[in-house]
Amino acid sequence: VCAYLQFDVPEGEKLTVRVASSFIGEEQAWLNFDREVKNKTVADLKIESAKLWNSMMGRIVAEGGNEEQMKTFYSCLYRVLLFPREFYEFDKSGKPVYYSPYDGKIHAGYMYTDNGFWDTFRAVHPLFTLVYPEVSERIMQALVNSYEESGFLPEWASPGHRGCMIGNNSLSLITDAWMKGIRSFDAKKALEAMVHQTQAQGREASVGRNGFEEYDKLGYVPYPDYVEATAKTLEYAYSDWCLSRFAASIGNVSIAEVYEKKSQNYKNLFDPSCGFMRAKNKDGEWIEPFRAIEWGGPFTEGSSWHYTWSVMHDIQGLAQLMGGHEQMGAKLDSMFNAPADYNVGTYGFVIHEIAEMVALDMGQYAHGNQPVQHAIYLYNYIGQPWKAQYHVREVLNRLYNSGPKGYCGDEDNGQTSAWYVCSAMGFYPVCPGQPEY
């Protein structure tokens, strides 16, 4: 739907145009008009908007630091709060209603859209549960609504299911909220949705679980049968851990045990001879040749340098695979000390994530994209917190600012901003799905 309006306005006069819209229909649009803009001036709306933003951003009172750091902090918090978008409206009685992008019908309740959980499960939603729990409550209800209307949980809503990125990170959102006391949604229906998400494939590769049959049979997703197979395996293992935690918390021991076992599948792709996560084919053979700096192929927007750390749910298990805390610490050190070399791999050209890693000049650490953003904090789990402190401060002070070039890469629905907000406050949700930062 589009419209073109032309006005004949005498020189020197001002024209005020008030517009309202609705995804539901004309009647709802007029309701929105009366509530939001009728008889209001631009100045009135500016004041209302300022009050609303202050009420949200004022929940965190930053102290210390200089003016530039304050500007950067609140600029990042502003970006965190831009997504996901509210896709619901209020009917005559003031109750929430929405047009569903999944079944095309009007429903009572809440709906959200424009959010890629592959990015935002890491820090955005854990920040919501802590500072904006009422937002998390509505998002959890919306996730269950999405499942009931489409048969799947969303992984990248835009406005409905979109074939983008990988993983079952909706399971992380639900588990993290539940474990932190946000329980105003149907837990049994949520568990049903979570299990189904791991045992079916939607029309888009990112909806459901791509390669779930092979994952269950082999203990990993084989490559090259499936693109991004190693990254998928690692993300599935984490999601299985989330599902196990959620099932156990509501008393479903049998499901919890099944998925706890699956959560250990990450071990199947660790090669002790080189200390990296690698790809295997369906016969269990390592894919050769292996180059830790090669992007794409079995990985998503990264290389083995970035995904080897994607075991947020079992850091001690990963350390054991590497030979212990000292060896894991040395491996982390080498990520920062290695040259920023790369092989474009299956991408065939230098994607912007590669260019950003090189420009950041932090070795193989690629803060400009999401998969490795938690890795700095792993030092805290192996008895070397001073190294985490050093690198966190380096990233805070060198890779962010309040200007137009204030980000070092993808900001992605607030995730890179949420990293700054959490880290500036002195904590980070390394493993969403447990009440720990």
For each predicted feature, which ranges?
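Acidic/polar, glycine-enriched structural segments that form the non-catalytic walls/loops
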Residues: V1-M111, F152-E155, S184, K188, ...
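A residue-level signal for conserved active-site and pocket-lining positions in enzyme catalytic cores
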Residues: G12, C76, I174, I315, ...
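Amphipathic, well-ordered alpha-helical segments in soluble domains
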Residues: L52, M56, I139, S239-C242, ...
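N-terminal catalytic cores of secreted or lumenal carbohydrate-active enzymes
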Residues: K71, S158-W178, I182
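Primarily short, surface-exposed interaction patches in extracytoplasmic proteins
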Residues: C76, L143-S158, A247
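Active-site core of glycosidic bond-cleaving carbohydrate-active enzymes
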Residues: H107-Y132, L171, G181-Y437
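Mobile, glycine-rich extracellular loop/lid and propeptide segments
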Residues: F121, S136-Q141, S146, H161-I166, ...
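Glycine-rich phosphate/pyrophosphate-binding loops
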Residues: P133-G151, C431-Q434
